Amino acid sequence: MRILLTNDDGIHAEGLSVLERIARTISDDVWVVAPEVDQSGLAHSLTLSEPLRLRPVSERRFALRGTPTDCVIMAVKKILDRKPDLVLSGVNVGANLADDVTYSGTVAGAIEGTLQGIRSIALSQAYQHAVGRDVPWDVAETHAPALIRTLMGVDLPDGTLINLNFPNCAVDAVAGVEVTSQGKLEFGLSIDERTDGRGFPYFWLRFGERAGDFRSGTDIRALRDNRISVTPLKLDMTDHAAQERIAQALREGSVA
């Protein structure tokens, strides 16, 4: 089985090394095409305003001056002589839960793999966001191989990818695996305005206290309870429940 790896934290990220070790427990045909630099938060974006620069790092490992989406496209369309059987994106430093998935370059790597007709899985490792806190990579590294093997045997509908999130706990404290839905997460975003040395303003996005929907069955609740979250995501974002309401409103409004 051929496996393609990518991420959004960059070619030198520790999570990518973890993912390589995970992948090599499953196959000896592992390829890496990852961003040259950190591309976190760029979601499913393409690089269209500048050229893509590809740099071989070592055998079957490449760094691309581009986004995770660019990386998957470059691998499938240029580097590989045939499509991989599996795309793994991650392991991200930090969870990608709830509304995070719309911003996530990690999830986007799996989205692009799915668009290319390849079984794709995004992997993220939760940790305590504080200076000096260690990321418990061993949780993902211990539990991911068996999960991936199981998920490869599931007959998923076309256009479906898997989003895996591993809890912030010790390996032996993991309380199981749960199939979840996306929760709801408020980021507490604000704008931090500062002034440079010439007196001109500049800005940073600032994350405040997060508020989450911890209802049973959500990805947020699973991680809070030290369970591994397995969330199937669909590329088709049509709100089918709203279609008839909108159609009825248009009919009543006599819109042609």
Curated annotation (Swiss-Prot):
Its EC number is 3.1.3.5. Keywords: Cytoplasm, Hydrolase, Metal-binding, Nucleotide-binding. It is found in: Cytoplasm. SUPFAM superfamilies: SurE-like. GO terms for molecular function: 3'-nucleotidase activity; 5'-nucleotidase activity; exopolyphosphatase activity; metal ion binding; nucleotide binding. Its cofactor is a divalent metal cation. It catalyses: a ribonucleoside 5'-phosphate + H2O = a ribonucleoside + phosphate. A divalent metal cation binds at D8, D9, S40, N92. Pfam families: SurE. GO terms for cellular component: cytoplasm. Binds 1 divalent metal cation per subunit. Its main location: cytoplasm. It is an enzyme of class 3 (hydrolase). Nucleotidase that shows phosphatase activity on nucleoside 5'-monophosphates. HAMAP family: SurE. Belongs to the SurE nucleotidase family. This is 5'-nucleotidase SurE. It comes from Rhizobium meliloti (strain 1021).
